[in-house]
Regions:
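Active-site helical microenvironments for divalent-metal-assisted chemistry
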Residues: 1-192
Length: 192
């Protein structure tokens, strides 16, 4: 937060990085959630996706100061809460590795196959949309791209929505200018 007035205006208390749930605890929550609806499902793909995402994002931090891996884990937990398949959850864990790390789409395809890499690539392409502009033609183009992605595989949109949901849940760490563009209820601290 830029100043104390902004903090009071939003009526929130910022957490110290030490207060965040550890990645290990979140990972165990993810596995437990998956086991509830797929008790016999082979989760080696999800375990591998977590290891690769954790390594790829190892040096990165979020604006809050927490390890970056917490974001993909929370996205994956949202997807697991929706009882998505293991390919979708793996793609949720990996959704930022091509965009934000040195990992390439080809490497991702080699490690996880074409289905997971297709989902990650689709989310990456949706990320390139202009979400914050008000111009009608940009909005129409964004909708066109989203409808095309939905026609190919609705899971791309579901992963992107889980990504946006987690980003909104951590909106208290956005710059004040960005916070002003969103309704107050979006950026209040809440469930991860």
């Amino acid at each position: 937060m830029a100043n104390e007035g902004t903090k009071e205006k939003l009526d929130i208390e910022l957490e110290a990085p030490a207060d965040f749930t550890s990645p290990e605890v979140l990972y165990q929550d993810l596995i437990n959630t998956i086991r509830k609806y797929h008790p016999s499902d082979d989760i080696t793909m999800i375990e591998k996706a977590y290891r690769i995402a954790d390594e790829a994002h190892k040096e990165q931090k979020r604006k809050s100061g927490e390890p970056y891996i917490i974001h993909p884990l929370c996205v994956a937990i949202i997807l697991a809460d929706l009882e998505m398949d293991k390919e979708t959850i793996a793609a949720g864990l990996l959704h930022d590795v091509v965009e934000d790390t040195i990992m390439t789409l080809e490497q991702l395809t080699k490690e996880f196959g074409s289905e997971v890499s297709f989902l990650v690539d689709g989310v990456t392409k949706l990320t390139q949309l202009n979400w914050d502009k008000d111009k009608v033609e940009i909005q129409a183009d964004n909708l066109r791209k989203m409808f095309l992605a939905m026609a190919k595989d609705i899971r791309v949109i579901i992963i992107k929505l889980a990504d946006r949901l987690h980003n909104m849940r951590t909106g208290q760490y956005w710059k004040p200018e960005k916070q002003k563009k969103c309704p107050k209820w979006i950026i209040l601290p809440g469930k991860r």
